[in-house]
């Protein structure tokens, strides 16, 4: 069903059954399959491919040659009807690829709201991207990766499958991340190592000085005290009772499967 206010270029192909919302625009030579749903106000430019069981929210901008909802590159994939879900107000730049999920995980790839996915970024199967993130040019998020709210993965960086980049963390350009990056941490290199807190990001996002000082103390406990992680956990748990940001920083110690960058 195509809303009466949607504007579909005559050279675009929108299969019967696709749900195209109010005030959506679709540019020439774009291909949208019958199982796609696009929310109101979204702009789909020329030469875009949107396939499969893909649901896209409101007011997104999708630039030329982006491919969303294509079959994933997992060898176990057998053509199952897995999905892509994208929220609102995202900017998806030229040649970005977002692949559908696998039944071996949650069968969906998720992108939240207000994200910037730069040119040729690759979002693999079963990735979960939060809100307000920045994924740089040619960055690669491997299968099952999580990038939490307000995190940044800069140009030409690669995140190993099953890794997490925590909230407000920042992965510098040309980095290879093979373990989890805790929230708020600045990481760089191949393999990526921690270089302190993402202080610029914290200040830009309104963190107060006392909270930043608490995070700096927590960071030193993990990375500079010489203590084991088991020794650090009760110290951080006590700090977390007063500072929610410290809890977010330390939660990954309990959930990590690949370990954290050291």
UniProtKB/Swiss-Prot annotation:
Record's keyword annotation contains Repeat: yes
Alphabetically sorted, this entry's keywords are: Acyltransferase, Cytoplasm, Lipid A biosynthesis, Lipid biosynthesis, Lipid metabolism, Repeat, Transferase
Give this protein's Gene Ontology molecular function annotations. Answer: acyl-[acyl-carrier-protein]-UDP-N-acetylglucosamine O-acyltransferase activity
> What top-level branch of life does the organism fall under?
Bacteria
Name the Gene3D superfamilies for this protein. Hexapeptide repeat proteins (2.160.10.10), Udp N-acetylglucosamine O-acyltransferase, C-terminal domain (1.20.1180.10)
Catalytic reaction(s) noted: a (3R)-hydroxyacyl-[ACP] + UDP-N-acetyl-alpha-D-glucosamine = a UDP-3-O-[(3R)-3-hydroxyacyl]-N-acetyl-alpha-D-glucosamine + holo-[ACP]
**What's any GO biological process attached to this entry?**
lipid A biosynthetic process
Q: What is its EC number?
A: 2.3.1.129
Disulphide bonds in the chain: none
UniProt GO cellular component terms: cytoplasm; membrane
Cellular localization per UniProt: Cytoplasm
Enzyme class, broadest EC rank: transferase
Entry-linked InterPro entries: Acetyltransf_C (IPR029098), Acetyltransf_C_sf (IPR037157), Hexapep (IPR001451), Lipid_A_LpxA (IPR010137), Trimer_LpxA-like_sf (IPR011004)
Task: Report the family membership.
Answer: Belongs to the transferase hexapeptide repeat family. LpxA subfamily.
Task: State the HAMAP family in the record.
Answer: LpxA
PANTHER family the record matches: ACYL-[ACYL-CARRIER-PROTEIN]--UDP-N-ACETYLGLUCOSAMINE O-ACYLTRANSFERASE (PTHR43480), ACYL-[ACYL-CARRIER-PROTEIN]--UDP-N-ACETYLGLUCOSAMINE O-ACYLTRANSFERASE, MITOCHONDRIAL-RELATED (PTHR43480:SF1)
Q: Which NCBIfam families match?
A: lipid_A_lpxA, PRK05289.1
Quaternary structure note: Homotrimer.
Q: What does this protein do?
A: Involved in the biosynthesis of lipid A, a phosphorylated glycolipid that anchors the lipopolysaccharide to the outer membrane of the cell.
* Name of the protein: Acyl-[acyl-carrier-protein]--UDP-N-acetylglucosamine O-acyltransferase
Native organism is Vibrio campbellii (strain ATCC BAA-1116)
Tell me the organism's taxonomic lineage. Answer: Bacteria, Pseudomonadati, Pseudomonadota, Gammaproteobacteria, Vibrionales
